[in-house]
Every structure is written in C-alpha cells, then in structure tokens.
C-alpha cells in the first residue's frame, strides 16, 4: 500500500493547486493562494492593490495577478503528484468521491428506465410520502457543494433514502440539510413547513415537498429527487434553449406557479436552477415558499430605516438572488406598494419568471456583471429592466412572447400578467410547433448541435464536420469568407446536393438560416458564396416568415440587396403570408436610399399600400428619411402623394408637417402637372398643404416660407382656408406678424384683399393682433381700408376699437386717414363710426397728429374736459398764449391746479403757476409714482443740473411736488433728485412677445391681481397707449393687465430647450401624469400664452407645463465641473458619500437624463439625474488655493498641511483632484475641489479697475470714483474684499475682488500718450496737447505718474487713466512684419528680425522702430504698428524647414524638408546656424523659414494606447490589449493611470509605454472597424456596412454613435472597435 502525502490546497477555495487556473501565486507578504481566487479578489478591488486575506498586508499588484511570483516549491509537489505518487488534500474526502462515482451509474440506469424520482420498491405509498410512516432515513451521498442560507451555518443537498417500518417500502429522495442555531424558533419553522406541505401536496408541476425531519442538530427537508434543471439543460445547449423548449418549460412552470398561487403559496425564488426536470423531462418548480420561513433570525423584525449605501436588504434576510428579485421584494421600497412586512405578492413571482425567461431566451443571467448594490440601484431606484431583455429582439422569439416578458418586468406589480394568462400564451404558441421528442434524460439520442433541421439530411454520418450546420453558422457570423466556401465545397464533394441543401436550410436557435445570417451581417461576399450553389433558396424564410432580403434591408447593405436580386429574389413579395407590408415598406422603414433604388429598379411597386393603409412614401416621410423618399419619387412614387392614410393625411401633408422642403421640391420637379394638381389641394383635417405650411410656428419659419413659395408656384389654391378658423395662408401669415411670409405670398400674385369665410381681409387681422410690420406691408400692397367684414367693420373701425389695447393702431389711423377715399363716416352693423370708438378712449391717448388728421377728414371729437390733477402741455401751434408765457416755455409740462371760469385754468409748472386757456393746452399721459424714467435724449443740460447720475441712468419716480417738480430716485443715491417733468420720459422696458415674470415680492398691483400668482411667467400680448401691459399667462383665459414695473424680464424658453420641474414646485399647475422632478423633456412647442408642450422620453403623449413651474437644464457636456443643487433635498439615487459641498467632473451623459460624475474620493462615478446638478466655475492650472475655513477634515487628508497652507495648482486630474505646489514641499499637495477655496489672485500693489461685464451698475463707491478710473490694491482682507487707493481721492475704499480686473501697471521708462477721445485730463492740460508724447519718470504708490513730455519743461503730473502706453518693442525682441505691409528689398510680410532701436526726430521719438533682418546690410525702419511680436528661437532647439518654403534663402546645403537639425548659433540679425548629423558644414537658415519640433509630453486627458514595441507592460496587461484605447486620468511620479471604457478601475502603466493618438470628437464620421468579429457590447442592429457620427464621448472614451437610418438610443461602442470614416463627407 503506497502512503499518501498531504498536498496543501488553497486556503480560500479549498481546491487542489494545478498549473492552470489554480496555479499557486505569492503575495508580497509571502502568503500564497491560487490564481483563480486572487483574480476574483482583485476584480473587486478599486485600485491596483490587493489585501492579503490572512495578514491584511497590502500588495501592489498592478493591472493583473499575472505579475505575481509563482510558488515554485508548491509546483514541485504538483509535478511529483503527476509522477504517480498518491496525495491527499486536507479539505477533500475521498470516500465522498467514491460514493458519488458509485451512485452515478445507478442514477443513470434509473433515469434510463424512467423511474420516478422518489421511486420505491412497491407503490403502496402513493405520490406523497408520509414522513411519519417512514422513520428510517439514510443519507447516501452529498449532491453539489455546500452553500449558506439565511441564518443557517450551512445548507447541504443530499441524495437519501427513506424506508417504512420493517422495511416494507423504500424511497429515493433529495434532502436539504440545514444546521440549526440556538436563536432559531424551530417549532415555528416546523409549523410553517407543515402548512406549506399541506398547501402544495396536490399541485401539479411542482417538486413534491414531503415534509421535514429533525436529526443530529439539523433540519432535513425531504423532496422529490429530479434529474437536472433548466439551467443544466441550458448548459448542455451551450447556454441557450430552443423555442420549443422555452415554450414547453414555460408552460410547465406557469401551470405549477398558478396552482401554487391558487393554494396560497408565493414562490419567491423562481430562477433556472430552481426549475428542475422530472423523469419525464417536464419542468417542475422547487424551493417554493421557503424563503420567508428560512430567513435570518435577525431579520424577523422590520427595520425602521434603510441606508442605501449598505446593501443589507430583505433579499439578504431571505437569501433571494438579486438577479431575479422583484422591486417590491427589496424591502426598503415596500411603502410604494403594500403595507405588509416584505412587500411581496403573487405578482412578485411574475417579475422573477420574467427574468428567468430572459435568461432562457438569451443565455445570459439578468444584470450579469453587476453587484447587488448596482442591481438595487437599477431595479428599485432607476426602475430599469434587465439590459439582456433588449437582446431578445431578433433572436426568433415570437413578438407576443417578447411582449409578455416585458409585461412581467413592469415596475408596478398590478401591471404584470397572471400565470394563468401566461400559460394560455405558451399553449397557444405550442400548438404551432410540431411535437418533437422530449429533451429529458430518457432520450438517449445525443444532441449534436443547436440548430433545428428543417429537412432531415440523407447523409448517414452526421458527425462529419461539413455536415454540421452549426459550424457553417459560426463562420458566417465571424465573417470568415474562406471558411464558408470550404465548408460548402466539402459538403458538395462529400454528400452531394442534398448535403449542401441541408446545410443551407438548417436554422439556428433563432430560426435563421446561413443566408439570413450572411444578410444580417451585410456581407455581399458571404451572400455570393452561399448563392453560388443551385441548392440555395434565395427566398428561404425564417421561422417568422421573413426572407433574407428583409435582413439585407435591415442591415442597410445595397450590395447584399443587389446580389439577392441578381439571384432572383422576389422584390414584390409581402410579409405575413402576403397580408403584411411589402419589402419596399420594410426598406422605407429602415431608410437606406441605395437599397430602395435597387428594389425599385428591379420592379418593386413604389406605390404599394400596406395593411394599415400606408404607402411606401408615407413610411419614409414619417421616419424623416429624406433621401429614401426622394428615391421613391424618382422611381415612380409620385402617385402616392394622392393617397390618404387612416388619419386622412397624404405624404404631402406629412412633408409639410415635418418641414421637409427637399422632398416637396423634388416632387414638384419629377411629377407631371396632372399628378401635382391631383394632390396639391387635397385637404387634411387641418387644411390643405398650403394652409399647413403658412401656419408653421417659430423656429421653422424659414422652411415654412420655402414651402409656401414652392406650393404656390406649383398651383396651390391661395383661397383655400383652414378647417378650424377659416383662414387663408395670407390671413394666417398676417395674424402671426410673419412679414417675410406675407411678402412671399404677395409676390406670388395673391390679392392683398383676399377674403375669408367671414369676409375678413388680412389687414383686419393684422390690425386686430397688432402685427405692425404686416400692417405696413399690406397697406403698401394696396389693402383697401374701406372693405367691411360680416360685422360691418372696416379697417378704421378695427384699428380704433383695438387701440385700447394696441397703441400703434392710433398711428395706423393717421396713416390710413391719408387715403383720399377713407370711409370714416361709415357705420358698422352696431351703428358705430370711427368717432364713436375714439370717444371711448381716454383723451390723453389721442395725439395732436391724430386730432389734426381727423379734422382734415371732418371728424370732430367732443371738447376735452379737464380735471384738477390732469397733466398738460401747450399745443405745438401756440406761439403766444393769451395771458403770456408767465415764465413757462412751449415744451413745459405741468398739471392742472385750479379750474377758473370761462375756460381759464391755473397750471403748476416748474417755473411757477401760469394762467392758460383750455384750448391752449392738451392732455398728457401722466408720470406716476413708482414708474421708471430717464432723461430725454434731446435734453442737453437738466434744469436742476447733474448730481452723480449719467444720461443713461434709470430712476424711479418717488413723488410729484405741488409745484410740478418730480422727485426721482437713482440707485446708490441718498435722496431724490429734482427733475422737470418736461425733461423726463418713461422707460420702455418691454415689447410685444417678450417673456416676463411677475415680481416675486409684489404685494399689490395697480390694476389688481385677479387670479394671478406672483412669480408666474407669461408673454407680453400688447402694449397699451399708456405704456401699461397686457400679459398672457398659460392658466388665464384672458390677458392680465399690469404696469411694466410690476414685472421683470426673464430668459425665454425656446423650442428644443431641455427642461425639468423646479424642485421648489411641490405640485405643478398641470398634473404630474406619472412624471417626477427627475423627468427631463424637450420643448417641442410653445403656445402663444407661454404654455410649454414637452416631449419626454418613453412617454406616449406630450406633457403640458406652466413655464413658471419649469427650469432649463444646463447644456452639460463631459468635462463640466458640477455639484448638487442647493434646492435638491436628495439626488435621484441617494447621497451615498456625496455632500452638498462636493465638486466633481461630468464623466458621462445618458440619453435618459442620468449622468455619471467623477469625484476624486470615489473609485466609481456617482450616478444621479441631470436635474440634480448645476455647473460651477472650474479650477485652472496656475490658480492659488487654500483650504476652506469650514473644513475640519479634508476628503483627501491634510498631508501634513494646515488651514494656513497656500498652494498653486500645477495639475488637475480628470476626477477634479487638484495637485498643488506648496513652498518647501517636495511632492504635490492633493486637494479635493470641494474642500478648496480660490484665492483672489490679487497682490498688494496690483493695478485694477472695474470689470466691463458689470454693465451700468457698479458699486456705488466705485460710481463715485468713475468706471474707467484706475486704483491700486492697498491691502487684502480675508472676506475677499480689497482695500483700494487712487491718486485723486483721499482715503481708501473696499470692493470685492470679483468686481475687479487686473491691468498692467505703468512703469518708469515707458513711452505714453493721451487716451483717444479724451476731453480733458484729470488736472487739466497744463500746456500739454492731445498729441503730446512723453516718458514716465515716476510712479507713485497710489498710481499717480509724472511724465516728461517732449517740448514741455518740468515733469507733468497725470492720472494713469488718462494715458496710454505707446506700442513699442524693446531692443533684442524678435518681431515679424505684419501681413499687408509693402515689401522692402528682400524683406516682406512674414519676415522675422531683431529690434535694434527706435527712431528719433530731433529730441522726440518719431514712432518708428529699427529692425535688423538677416541677409540685409541695412536696417529696416518703419512704424511700430507694422510689426508684431514673434517667438524667439534659442540655441539647442530642433527645427526643420516649413513645407511652404520651396527654396530657402541661403540654399538647401544638401538637405531637404525632411532634415531635422539643431540650432547651434544665432546671429544678431536672427540668422540661424543649424547643425545636422548628415551635413558636412553648418546650414544657414532664415528664422521665418523654419518651424520648431517639440515632442509634447503626455498630459491628463490625452487619448493613448500601448506602443507596438511593448510586449508586456511593467504592471501587466490585465484586461487591456495592444489595440485598446484609453484616456489618461491621473499622473503620479512617472506612472500614468489610464481610464478604459470597459474597466471599472484605472489601468496603471509607465509613461514611456504609451503613445498619443487622435481622440474621437463629437461630430466625427465613423464606422465599425473592418475585420472585427464582435464589438465589445454586441452588434445590435449594426453591421460592418453601418456608418454614423459620434454624438457623445464619455470621459473614459466610451463612444455614443448615431448610425444612419437608425432610431432610438445611440449605439454604445469601444473606441478600439471604431475607426474614422474617411469616405464620408
């Protein structure tokens, strides 16, 4: 007997070491573990280190455990073991292995005989075993591995036998053995299990639960023993099931769960491994109802609160698999559904079953690759479905089944289907499939491949390689052209035509043949290779009845379509057995124009109508595939323009509705006049195409004009009226004040006096709506002011009536009254004339010009009645009043103080009281308290003088004194300024169409609030003659009357803006309708009253919103600096470790509104909604920072620094980490941006002035100093305020540093002159002149300068704000001659030289500069303005000749453009002496002829890949390969941390191992790399023929691509799989 030697095993997994995945590796601490365990531990690490499981020592691993040393001593033992010695492992039991081997044959035999799982020696016991009558239980062998469950120490599955007393019967069962602990309520558990047994004992399609036995401190659950599971069956089929298996197993499970629900049992644990197969191959449900019974004792009571950062959920208590757990079963969100303890219900099983079906259909576990916390965030917080669900589409699953699975995954339990309904669905589809032999263990025929043979091959040797269809499908999917040809050739040579036919007709699990797969890939070469054989059927259909031509069209490959048509594909076929759409409809759905051209040229019907009444052209226009629609029209599809669909819309109507000018223009070009006339005037529900085009709203007015112009030229009826309002195109354009469109219609010959159904002409509508531009154009075009509508109103009536709202109409009355035939005496049907309407207006609204125009037409208004307090002025025709001027002037304004007899009145003017006659004055619109006013433009000097304010200053009327003087308050002034009312005018702040907001702090309104709420937003409807406003609000039926001072301007919303509901709005004015604060939508339409129509993704109908409830979302892009808004109480997915002060960098942007933000203290991006964050000012390299005073513990630690430490930012990582240089510190100080505070950047002695961006409202102190004044920083305060001093003011004042900008200080020796346009210097001219020049001799600490002007004795004292530095260069500076300067000798524009001095005329500088250019003996002298600064070259720089230089000035000297040399010397005139290794002598070059070569080092943000010369990086490859593309994220002491889109952690390497590559940018035209077998995240609907453009680039390089003719979300791709498309654009 040979002795056994103990071989140490891995202490983590208890598995013997080997030389493959279990090879022993050593950590830096000396402890060793197997490679597989270390890889799994490293995969959960957030960085490049790994903590030893035994001693907790941290080892630097790099990018992969491959770099760790092997334990060669252990490997020697493994080699010795393979030599024949017997070894044991401390953690294994040989007897168990032997028992398992012994039992395997018996199990196989029993399965082959078809015995029931719990078979017995005799059948007296029935299907359910009475545990009490079978006291003898023996555990035979353990099945599988030990696992843990709930609060139990371990759960073991055993193969066991139970026998009745006296050995009368014996049964084979499966036993779940669980160790009991002291804190378990065993009695309660046994009672619950007994109730479960009784409830389920008569249910079908369930694994029978026989009862529970307590033995040896364990609880044993007895149940039927089965022969595999759905999961094992999937593994046998390479991870997938056939459609038949999905339907059969689905029906079995649905039946079993439905019966359990009827018995009151909720399964709670449905997943493929718990769906077992009995001896007959039927699926049965196991582990039902056990989860709540076997939960942890610590979870018996409901926790009062939940911390989402700790994934200790209900799933932990009941040990549910998170991959299949319904949202309501996660515990913390139970309040969203029910009030019971766990939140589960029978509908929860529907979710689990849906996830299980997803795995059965795709072969992938739902949420595969995500942690439990990530699954919780996705399922409960984001309400997402498993991403694998999307992969079901296109794999041969019936649409009804796919839809049913989607309904199972509804977030709301009430929306999920019942299991009875699902059973009916499965049975209905099973009836359509011929019954095949069961896939049970009894079926002894081995499954050869995963395809269903349509016709059984005649070849008897089905194991031959070429006869296996799976191989053919594999090489087709890989694009292996030679492999396809070889397989088909061997099949033809070996088995003849029948073998080839069987290969080509075979279908994969998705029901597709090899030809379908080749077309789906878009490879014309593969299609040709298959169709070379006569046995190939070009119109073979898949299980859904689709021919290969449909797949080629979906792939967008015109080459494949051409090959199929050449081989006889039927281009006039229809889908769904002839009752569905034609292949042309399929092509128009996908939109590839070249494919459509191939079909139509081959004979496809361009005017075919599908089963929904839509033509091919309808489909193309609806999808906005313009090129495809044009191809249809060019190939006989013009007749489709006359076909109306179910919504009574023709393709022409749809083109107008989608502003598709190109299609309509091409239709007019290719169609006959008869075809155009038949289609152009067909009415839609809203009117003809012309009416629709004229009504196109804002942001598309240009397209609307083009459409109207095209349609009118093509013969559209201009008198056609829309169905709703009875307006023609001209009426609609005039009412919308679209003057360009009105001009287009009039230029087309349409009569300006065209009438609508109400006999209204366009001029009437323009006057009624205040469309002033259109009124002017219509009057110029001959509109008749005398035409009356059905109410008898002409243009005069309408203008006078609307003047109460539209003040411009009073001016239009003056214009219209000039018409020689103006019908001013005509009465309307109500008996009113123009005079009646004007009499109803306040007399002060009627100007003197209008009164004179009316008098000329014989219209006399009643005498004006004056009252005390009325504002008046003298009529302009008064030259000498009856009582004289009495101190007043012709333009004086006053108010009535007393009314005397005989029309005499006492008027209070600023100059005093005056007696005037009533017919000598006219009424004026008064200025009232609170109104905004300013000085009239024609006033040169105010009556009461200036007092600090400027001509542009806007003030507020405080009061009107009894003597007629106004008191006006200005910002910053301590008291009111006296003003003559004749010199002031009201400020016009708003015009029609402006967006305004009612002031939030408004407590009372002059004209009343009504139903209006402060803070509401609206649009100015019109401006009344008294300057008051009518504002349209979305929630009011009529405009609201207000004063301009009661509202404030607000940034308007525009079509296309992305918006969300404000966080301060608890309940929006228009109901939520299922939306939340996190819902993000795009404005698609804006009503006249400001009502927003918003398109929200995944919402079937638009959502309405009041603009005051909404806010714009910043136009974020990757790289923006952001933080959580102050108004956000909690981000969409919780705070986690983020605080309000945290600042991060935008990492990714999803289309659904979610964003990923990189924070320097997190290893993974923080997920939240785009509505949760706002932009902040980013930090920049070079800025000085210190720690914010409120910070006690920085995120990244103090690093031996203090709150007083000041650092200069030297580098910024992509996660926002600030690396700052601190004086006296060797390494950079790493600071979180949320902890840092930016210093002002100013120093004592800096020269500053007010920022121009402050507009007209600087601080009051600075206003007293003067906007253009210059000050000097005297001291810097901690609060951010700077103490300033200036040369003309005593004392100092404080201003915040954000209001200031730094300017260059004047220095001694600089040449200066006076500022252009200066009227007088601060202290007068004092013999100086505006053109004087001088040199600064002294600069004082307060900025005062002393200048020595040429020709003036002594030093001249000056304010630096009055002076300007002369542009001049210092001696030795390198300069370049500017473009446009005339040539001098060999010197021309672009020549580079060196400054040698300046020119003088006598003792004064003449403004010229002397420059030495190489190659010229004389120096160039000319104006300094002809020169610009050039980059100075230095010795040692590498250079080469510019490609634009054909012949260097001093010759090539044996060199070429490719020669690179080093500057060895530079002459005083700039001539370069270049050394090159190839040259025999020094090479002379002109500095203007060369360019420097600088090898730029890698920096953060660069796109990189590993150099081709690197075989193994210093820190190993890990998951990265030589073609991987990443982005430099961080730099640390020569090491680079690179972010790859497929890695969660940063990849570590040396800087020298990488090379810079061109980054992808938004807008790049791209395609999928040739030769790529499978993109990293799958093909989706794309192929190698797909071309598109980049619409998004994440910070880690992940690309979001919009491919041509594809709808929905962008395609996500790895940049290594994508290349630039050089052929596009």
Curated annotation (Swiss-Prot):
Q: Which GO terms describe its biological process?
A: abscisic acid-activated signaling pathway; defense response; developmental growth; endosomal transport; late endosome to vacuole transport; negative regulation of abscisic acid-activated signaling pathway; protein ubiquitination; response to abscisic acid
Q: Which UniProt keywords apply?
A: Abscisic acid signaling pathway, ANK repeat, ATP-binding, Endosome, Golgi apparatus, Kinase, Metal-binding, Nucleotide-binding, Phosphoprotein, Repeat, Serine/threonine-protein kinase, Transferase, Ubl conjugation, Ubl conjugation pathway, Zinc, Zinc-finger
> Could you name the Gene Ontology cellular component terms for this entry?
early endosome; trans-Golgi network
Where mainly located? Golgi
Presence of the UniProt keyword Mitochondrion in the record:
no
Entry-linked Pfam families: Ank_2, Pkinase, SH3_15, zf-RING_UBOX
Q: Which pathway does the protein contribute to?
A: Protein modification; protein ubiquitination
User: PTM comment for this protein?
Assistant: Autophosphotylated and autoubiquitinated in vitro.
- Subunit composition? Interacts with ABI5 and EDR1.
Free-text note regarding domains? The RING-type zinc finger domain mediates binding to an E2 ubiquitin-conjugating enzyme.
Name of the protein: E3 ubiquitin-protein ligase KEG
Organism of origin is Arabidopsis thaliana
């Amino acid at each position: 007997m040979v002795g056994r030697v103990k071989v140490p095993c891995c202490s983590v997994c208890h598995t013997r070491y080997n030389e493959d995945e279990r090879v022993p590796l050593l950590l830096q601490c000396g402890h060793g573990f197997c490679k597989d365990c270390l890889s799994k531990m490293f995969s959960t690490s957030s960085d490049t280190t790994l903590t030893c499981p035994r001693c907790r020592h941290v080892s630097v691993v790099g990018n992969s455990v491959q770099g760790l040393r092997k334990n060669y001593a252990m490997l020697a033992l493994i080699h010795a073991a393979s030599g024949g010695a017997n070894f044991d492992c401390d953690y294994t039991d040989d007897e168990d292995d032997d028992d398992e081997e012994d039992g395997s044959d018996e199990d196989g035999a029993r399965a082959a005989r078809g015995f029931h799982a719990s078979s017995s020696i005799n059948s007296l016991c029935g299907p359910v075993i009475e545990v009490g009558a079978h006291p003898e239980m023996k555990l035979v062998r353990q099945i599988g591995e030990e696992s843990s469950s709930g609060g139990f120490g371990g759960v073991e599955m055993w193969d066991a036998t139970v026998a009745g007393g006296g050995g009368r019967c014996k049964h084979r069962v499966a036993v779940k053995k669980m160790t009991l602990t002291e804190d378990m309520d065993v009695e309660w558990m046994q009672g619950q299990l007994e109730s479960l047994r009784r409830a389920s004992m008569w249910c079908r399609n369930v694994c029978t639960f026989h009862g529970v036995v307590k033995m040896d401190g364990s609880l044993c659950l007895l149940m039927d023993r089965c022969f595999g599971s759905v999961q094992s069956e999937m593994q046998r089929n390479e991870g997938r099931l056939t459609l038949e298996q999905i339907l059969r197993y689905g029906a079995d499970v649905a039946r079993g769960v439905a019966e359990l629900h009827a018995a009151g049992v909720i399964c709670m644990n449905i997943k493929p491994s718990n769906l077992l197969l009995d001896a007959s191959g039927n699926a049965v449900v196991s582990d039902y109802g056990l989860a709540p019974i076997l939960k942890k004792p610590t979870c018996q009571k409901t926790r009062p609160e939940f911390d989402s950062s700790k994934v200790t959920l209900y799933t932990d208590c009941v040990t549910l698999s998170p991959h299949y757990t319904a949202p309501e079963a996660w515990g913390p969100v139970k309040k969203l559904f029910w009030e019971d303890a766990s939140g589960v219900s029978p509908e929860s099983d529907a979710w689990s079953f849906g996830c299980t079906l997803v795995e059965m259909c795709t072969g992938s576990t739902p949420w595969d690759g995500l942690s439990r916390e990530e699954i919780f965030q996705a399922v409960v917080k984001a309400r997402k479905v498993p991403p694998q669900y999307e992969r079901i589409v296109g794999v041969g699953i019936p649409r009804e089944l796919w839809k049913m699975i989607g309904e199972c995954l509804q977030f709301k339990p009430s929306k999920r289907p019942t299991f009875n309904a699902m059973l009916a669905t499965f049975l209905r589809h099973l009836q359509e499939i011929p019954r095949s032999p069961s896939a049970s263990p009894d079926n002894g025929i081995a499954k050869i491949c995963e395809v269903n043979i349509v016709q059984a091959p005649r070849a008897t040797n089905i194991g031959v390689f070429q006869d296996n269809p799976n191989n053919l499908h594999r090489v087709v999917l890989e694009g292996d052209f030679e492999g396809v040809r070889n397989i088909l050739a061997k099949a033809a040579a070996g088995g003849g035509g029948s073998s080839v036919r069987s290969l080509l007709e075979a279908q994969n699990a998705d029901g597709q043949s090899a030809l379908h797969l080749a077309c789906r890939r878009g490879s014309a070469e593969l299609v040709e290779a298959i169709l070379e054989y006569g046995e190939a059927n070009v119109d073979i259909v898949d299980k859904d009845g689709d021919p290969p031509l449909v797949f080629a069209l979906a792939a967008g490959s015109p080459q494949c379509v051409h090959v199929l048509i050449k081989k006889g594909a039927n281009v006039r076929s229809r889908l769904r057995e002839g009752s569905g759409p034609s292949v042309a409809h399929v092509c128009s759905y996908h939109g590839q124009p070249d494919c459509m051209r191939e079909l139509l040229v081959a004979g496809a019907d361009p005017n075919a109508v599908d089963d929904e009444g839509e033509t091919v052209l309808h489909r193309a226009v609806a999808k906005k595939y313009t090129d495809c629609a044009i191809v249809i029209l060019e190939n006989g599809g013009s007749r489709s323009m006359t076909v109306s669909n179910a919504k009574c819309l023709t393709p022409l109507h749809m083109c107008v509705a989608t502003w598709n000018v190109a299609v309509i223009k091409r239709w007019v070009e290719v169609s006959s006049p008869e075809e155009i006339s038949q289609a152009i005037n067909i009415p839609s529900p809203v009117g003809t195409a012309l009416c629709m085009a004229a009504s196109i709203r804002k942001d598309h007015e240009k397209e609307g004009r083009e459409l109207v112009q095209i349609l009118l030229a093509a013969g559209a009826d201009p008198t056609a009226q829309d169905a709703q309002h009875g307006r023609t195109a001209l009426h609609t354009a005039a009412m919308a004040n679209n003057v360009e469109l009105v001009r287009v219609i009039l230029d087309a010959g349409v009569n300006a006096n065209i009438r609508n159904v109400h006999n209204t002409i366009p001029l009437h509508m323009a006057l009624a709506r205040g469309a002033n531009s259109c009124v002017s154009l219509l009057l110029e075009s001959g509109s008749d002011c005398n035409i009356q509508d059905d109410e008898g109103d002409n243009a005069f009536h309408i203008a006078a009536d609307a003047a109460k709202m539209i003040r411009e109409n009073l001016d239009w009355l003056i214009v219209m009254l000039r018409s020689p035939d103006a019908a001013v005496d005509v009465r309307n049907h109500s008996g009113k004339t123009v005079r009646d309407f004007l009499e109803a207006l306040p007399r002060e609204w009627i100007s003197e010009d209008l009164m004179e125009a009316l008098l000329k037409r014989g219209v006399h208004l009643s005498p004006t009645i004056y009252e005390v307090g009325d504002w008046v002025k003298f009529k302009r025709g008064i030259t000498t009043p009856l009582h004289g001027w009495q101190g007043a002037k012709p333009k004086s304004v006053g108010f009535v103080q007393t009314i005397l007899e005989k029309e005499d009145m006492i008027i209070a003017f600023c100059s005093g009281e005056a007696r005037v006659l009533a017919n000598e004055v006219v009424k004026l619109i008064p200025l009232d308290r609170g109104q905004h006013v300013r000085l009239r433009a024609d006033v040169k000097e105010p009556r009461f003088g200036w007092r600090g304010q400027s001509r542009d200053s806007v003030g507020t009327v405080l009061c009107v004194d009894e003597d007629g003087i106004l008191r006006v308050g200005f910002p910053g002034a301590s008291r009111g300024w006296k003003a003559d009312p004749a010199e002031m005018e009201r400020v016009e702040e708003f015009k029609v169409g402006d967006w305004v907001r009612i002031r939030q702090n408004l407590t009372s309104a002059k004209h009343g609030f009504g139903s209006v709420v402060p803070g509401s937003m609206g649009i100015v409807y019109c401006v009344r003659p008294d300057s008051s406003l009518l504002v349209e609000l979305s929630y009011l039926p009529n405009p609201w009357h207000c004063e301009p001072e009661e509202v404030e301007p607000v940034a308007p919303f525009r079509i296309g803006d992305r918006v969300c509901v404000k966080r301060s709005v608890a309940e929006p004015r228009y109901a939520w309708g299922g939306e939340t604060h996190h819902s993000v939508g795009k404005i698609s339409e804006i009503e006249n009253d400001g009502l927003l129509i918003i398109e929200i993704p995944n919402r079937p109908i638009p959502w309405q919103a009041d603009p005051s409830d909404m806010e714009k979302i910043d136009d974020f892009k990757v790289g923006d600096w952001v933080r959580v808004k102050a108004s956000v109480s909690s981000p969409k997915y919780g705070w986690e470790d983020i605080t309000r002060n945290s600042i991060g960098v935008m990492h990714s942007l999803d289309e659904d509104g979610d964003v990923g933000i990189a924070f320097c203290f997190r290893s993974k991006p923080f997920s939240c909604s785009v509505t949760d964050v706002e932009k902040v000012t980013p930090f920049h390299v070079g800025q000085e920072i210190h720690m914010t005073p409120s910070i006690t513990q920085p995120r990244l630690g103090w690093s031996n620094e203090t709150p007083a430490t000041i650092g200069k930012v030297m580098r910024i990582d992509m996660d926002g980490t600030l690396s700052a240089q601190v004086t006296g510190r060797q390494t950079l100080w790493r600071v979180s941006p949320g902890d840092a505070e930016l210093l002002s950047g100013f120093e004592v002695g800096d020269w500053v002035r007010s920022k121009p961006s402050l507009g007209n409202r600087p601080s009051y102190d600075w206003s007293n100093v003067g906007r253009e004044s210059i000050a000097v920083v005297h001291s810097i305060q901690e609060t951010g305020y700077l103490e300033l001093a200036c040369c003309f003011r005593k004392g100092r004042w404080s201003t915040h540093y954000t209001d200031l900008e730094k300017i260059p200080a004047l220095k001694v020796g600089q040449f200066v002159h006076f500022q252009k346009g200066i009227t007088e210097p601060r202290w007068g001219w004092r013999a100086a002149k505006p053109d004087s020049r001088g040199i600064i001799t002294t600069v004082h600490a307060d900025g005062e300068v002393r200048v020595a002007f040429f020709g003036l004795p002594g030093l001249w004292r000056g304010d630096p704000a009055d002076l300007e530095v002369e542009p001049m260069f210092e001696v030795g500076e390198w300069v370049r001659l500017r473009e446009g300067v005339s040539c001098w000798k060999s010197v021309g524009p672009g020549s580079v030289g060196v400054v040698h001095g300046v020119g003088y005329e006598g003792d004064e500088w003449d403004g010229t500069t002397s420059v030495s250019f190489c190659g010229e003996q004389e120096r160039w002298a000319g104006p300094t303005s002809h020169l610009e600064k050039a980059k100075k070259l230095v010795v040692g720089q590498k250079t080469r000749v510019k490609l634009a230089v054909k012949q260097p000035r001093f010759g090539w000297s044996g060199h070429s453009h490719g020669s690179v040399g080093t500057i060895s010397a530079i002459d005083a005139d700039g001539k370069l002496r270049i050394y090159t290794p190839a040259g025999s002598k020094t090479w002379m070059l002109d500095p203007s002829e060369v360019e420097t070569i600088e090898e730029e080092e890698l920096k953060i943000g660069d796109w990189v890949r590993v150099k081709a010369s690197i075989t193994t990086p210093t820190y190993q490859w890990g998951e990265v390969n030589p073609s991987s593309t990443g982005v430099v994220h961080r730099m640390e002491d020569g090491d680079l941390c690179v972010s790859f889109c497929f890695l969660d952690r940063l990849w570590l390497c040396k800087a020298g191992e990488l090379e810079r590559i061109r980054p992808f940018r938004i807008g790049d035209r791209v395609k999928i790399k040739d030769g790529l077998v499978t993109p990293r995240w799958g093909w989706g609907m794309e192929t190698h023929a797909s071309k598109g453009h980049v619409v998004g680039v994440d910070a880690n390089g992940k690309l979001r691509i919009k491919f041509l003719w594809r709808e929905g979300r962008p395609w996500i791709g790895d940049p290594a799989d994508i290349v630039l498309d050089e052929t596009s654009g």
